[in-house]
Amino acid sequence: MKTLNLIGLDKEKSKELVNHLNDLLANYQIFYQNLRGFHWNVKGSNFFELHAKFEEYYNDAIEKVDEIAERVLTLEGTPLHSYSAYMKQAEIKEVTGVSDGNRCVKEIVGNLGILIRKEREILALAAEIGDDGTQDVILPYHLEIDAIQEARKEFMDATCIFK
């Protein structure tokens, strides 16, 4: 017999989902901090455009961090909440000393690839256990990353920074 949590989901499957969400949380925290560093330190001919875009991205990332942590709590888990835990858990690595706009964009693109893969895993598991709430939280993130990737392609074409 299955044991259900307060929102009617299988407790064991919910724990697995919490682990995935905590992994995503850790990756978003490192992504957020990288974005802050890029925002503060970017230099070059595209400074103004990149500086503003990086701020937009880090403001968005920190909102996602809070929403993911709240979803972990809803699933009766404990969100990771120390930087050392984030560093240990995250696949996204801390980036330091980067001021070149091209390199910043390349790092962001790589990080977005990691995030979208992790979001796909969460969406699949949430669908499997009937967790519509987690799907409602994560699906918009997934769609936003697709839009960001498209905007990045347009930016690269317009500025020719990778050619």
Model feature map: region roles:
Residues 63, 136-163:
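Short, contiguous alpha-helical
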Residues 15-25, 29, 55-58, 62, ...:
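Short amphipathic alpha-helical segments with heptad-repeat character
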Residues 2-24, 101:
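Disorder-to-helix initiation segments
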Residues 42-84, 155:
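Conserved alpha-helical segments that form or flank metal/cofactor-binding pockets of metalloenzymes
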Residues 9-16, 30-56, 118-134:
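Helix-loop segments that flank and shape redox-cofactor active sites
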Residues 25, 32, 39, 58, ...:
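A structural signal for well-ordered alpha-helices, especially hydrophobic packing surfaces
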Residues 47, 79, 83-87, 109, ...:
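Long, contiguous binding/interaction regions
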